[in-house]
Regions:
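Compact alpha-helical subdomains of small soluble proteins
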Residues: 71-137
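Positively charged n-region of N-terminal signal peptides that target proteins for export
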Residues: 1-4
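Bacterial N-terminal signal peptides
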Residues: 6-15
Length: 137
């Protein structure tokens, strides 16, 4: 209940702050765009590990590779938005970089284990999966 009151107060004050020039709308939209891109990159890291873990034979490895190439394409699409982090204030930059780093660390052990397994199984004979993994490096 108290969060609803805080949110309502913020929602009422925000347009006033923008009108008085206290908050730059361009800065807010850039920060929002960067944060959205960073959040998506965090989700993508988990998705990559899940796709790699789904490879159990050649057929599933080929299917995972196809999806991985789409994910890689999405990461490339997000790059311009992520690069705008430079225009955010230092505190925002630090917060967003920390968030991305924590997401990377959180999936790091799983990614290493699944990578080792894929190498041991020679990518289940899937050249597509091998190419997708190379493209991510």
């Amino acid at each position: 209940m108290k969060y609803a009151a805080i949110f309502a107060a913020f929602a009422m004050c925000f347009p006033v702050c923008m009108a008085q020039g206290i908050v730059d709308p361009a800065a807010v939209s850039v920060e929002s765009k960067v944060e959205t891109a960073i959040n998506e990159l965090c989700d993508i890291q988990v998705k990559i590990v899940e796709l790699l873990e789904s490879a159990k034979d050649k057929e599933s490895a080929d299917a995972a590779a196809e999806e991985l190439f789409m994910v890689i394409g999405r990461v490339q699409e997000l790059q311009p938005d992520v690069q705008q982090i430079r225009s955010c204030d230092a505190a925002t930059q630090q917060r967003l970089v920390k968030k991305l780093l924590q997401a990377t660390i959180a999936v790091g052990a799983r990614k290493k284990a699944v990578g080792k397994s894929l190498v041991e199984h020679q990518f289940y004979g899937s050249e597509d999966l091998k190419d997708a993994v190379r493209a991510m490096l």
